[in-house]
Every structure is written in C-alpha cells, then in structure tokens.
Regions:
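Hydrophobic transmembrane alpha-helices of multi-pass small-molecule transport proteins
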Residues: 50, 54, 73, 121-141, ...
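Glycine-/small-residue-enriched transmembrane alpha-helix faces in small-molecule transporters
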Residues: 1-40, 44-46, 77, 85, ...
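Helix-helix packing/entry segments at the starts of transmembrane helices
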Residues: 98-104, 170-189, 221-257
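Transmembrane alpha-helices of multi-pass small-molecule transport proteins
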Residues: 33-81, 106-109, 162-169, 183-201, ...
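Hydrophobic/aromatic residues within transmembrane alpha-helices
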Residues: 31, 38, 42, 89, ...
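Loop-to-transmembrane-helix transition segments
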Residues: 9-19, 60-85, 127, 150-159, ...
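Membrane-interface helix termini and inter-helical loops of multi-pass transporters
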Residues: 26-34, 91, 137-151, 195-214, ...
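Specific alpha-helical transmembrane segments that line the substrate/conduction pathway
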Residues: 37, 44-48, 87-118, 159, ...
Length: 296
C-alpha cells in the first residue's frame, strides 16, 4: 500500500474510532442501569475481548517487571472511577453537556503536565484554562448542586481530571505495552475494584439490555481502541490529537439523531468554546514538540 493509501486508511480508522468513542455516551441513556453497574459489565466484556485480541496478536499478557503490576493496579483504579463518573455525568445532565464537561481534559493536561515533566507553563495555557472555565460556566443552569445538570457538569469535570491523571501516568510509566495490553489490565482491575459495590441482579437484566452491554463492551470499547492503535501507525500525533477533538461533536450529533436531545444556545456556545480551546491547545502542543529550525 502506498504512503497516501496508508494515510487514507489510518484517517478512516481514526474517524471511526473517534465516532465510536463518542457513541459510548449514548449508553448512559440507553442502558437502564446505574453508572457503576454499566461500567462494571462494560469492563467485564471488554477485558475478555481484549485478552483474546492480545492472544490472537501473539502478544504477552504477562508484564515485563513486577513493579508494572502496581502501576497497572493504580491505572485500573483511576480508569474505573473515570468511567463511572463519565456515565454518571451524562445520566445527571445530558450526553452533550456531559461530554463537553469531560472534554476539558486536553486543557487540564496542558496545565497539569508541567508538574510531571518540570517544563514551563506558558501564558497562553493559562488563557486557555480561563477560556475553558468560561465555557463550563456557560453550561451551568444555576450555581447549586441541587440541580442535576450542575451536578452532572461537576461530575464530568471530575471525570476529566481522572482521565488526565490516567493519561499522564500511562505516558510516564506504561508506554512499553500495546494499547490492547494496557487496556486489558485497566479493565480487569476495574472489574475487581467495582465488583464489591454493584447493585446488579443478573436475572433481572433483559435480553435487550444484555445486547446493548455487548455492543458497548465489544463495538464501542474494544473495537475503537484497536482502530485507534492501528491508526497511530499511519498518522502523525498531531493529526490524531486534532481528530480526537471531534469526539464531543460526534457524541452530540448521535444524541440528537438517536435520543432526540437538543442543545440550548448557552450549551452550544459553551461547548464551542471548550472544544475550540481543546483544538487550539492540541495544535500548539504538537508545534512545541516539533524540532526548532531557527531559534534566533
């Protein structure tokens, strides 16, 4: 396959992966279970599928170093809390609002990463942080946690903080493993973390709900991670980051088409501000990582 053909294939895989990632939000509304129970069953199914993918691709399930199991445990705990808060945010508010609140994470990454790397924080990053804060404020209907939408926004921001922490820790300590290996351990640990807290009665779950759970665990969890990993072979990190910023748009469009969710003007403006800032920071971060041709 030519380089142009590889890039086209990678871009198709990437957009499909981001579309599927955006589609996960719909299941917070479609599956009649709590956020914790949805996450638990999602992780059970995804862990099984990911283990099979690792074996079929002839990779090792065993980790290289003993200390990596402790890192996998920490990452799994963070992922379990991230996914529970991710679904809870949308159950409390709406798919669009929950996803916009969650998508504050690219700017959070820019603001928090210097603490991990010792790099300098730029003025533009602080301005981006203020822009995202303004965007989130526009989403809030009233400054009271008694309002479910306001609470959902707060929970979505907590989910973004957890996701940011997971990404930074993974980047620093767990990059020796493929996406399938890493996600297998994170979903498997999440099952162990969440299992004691579930309120499931398996016998009461309908066949339709089981079908939705299988769809979520296989098509909307394992498959997009595999597609995303494949796309990384053909595309630059900048392209991947910029396309990933379309996730809230895809999620909101799917919610509008399939769930008949509508956007208020304030939500549309706030969401545009958050996503535009995420796009800007993603673009700038990759520019800063590029080799400098002329420093004079």
């Amino acid at each position: 396959m030519s380089a142009k053909g590889q890039a086209r294939t990678g871009l198709t895989e990437l957009h499909l992966a981001v579309l599927l990632f955006g589609g996960t939000a719909l299941f917070s509304r479609l599956i009649p279970l709590s956020a914790l129970d949805i996450t638990l069953l999602r992780c059970v199914i995804a862990a099984i599928v990911l283990a099979l993918l690792v074996k079929l691709s002839r990779q090792r399930l065993r980790l290289l170093r003993g200390k990596d199991y402790l890192i996998a445990l920490l990452l799994g705990v963070i992922v379990s809390l991230h996914w529970v808060t991710y679904f809870a945010a949308m159950q409390l508010s709406s798919v669009a609002i929950g996803m916009i609140a969650f998508f504050t994470y690219p700017v959070m990454t820019v603001l928090i990463e210097p603490w991990f790397t010792g790099s300098r924080l730029h003025l533009r990053d602080l301005v981006s942080g203020l822009a995202v804060l303004l965007g989130v404020i526009l989403l809030i209907p009233e400054p009271s946690l008694g309002n479910d939408v306001t609470l959902g926004i707060l929970v979505g921001v907590v989910s973004a903080i957890l996701f940011t922490a997971r990404n930074l820790l993974h980047k620093r300590y767990f990059t020796a493993y493929s996406g399938q290996q890493a996600m297998f351990y994170q979903t498997a640990v999440a099952v162990l973390v969440l299992a004691p807290w579930h309120s499931l009665d398996v016998g009461d779950i309908s066949n339709q709900t089981w079908g939705l759970l299988l769809l979520l665990g296989i098509v909307f969890t394992a498959a997009p991670h595999a597609l995303f990993t494949s796309a990384l072979r053909y595309l630059s990190a900048k392209t991947v980051g910029l396309v990933a910023c379309l996730q809230p748009f895809y999620g909101a469009m799917l919610a509008w088409l399939l769930l008949d969710e509508s956007l208020t003007l304030a939500t549309a403006i706030g969401g545009t501000l958050v996503v535009a800032t995420a796009l800007f920071e993603t673009s700038q971060s990759h520019k800063s990582q590029a080799p400098k041709k002329n420093l004079g």
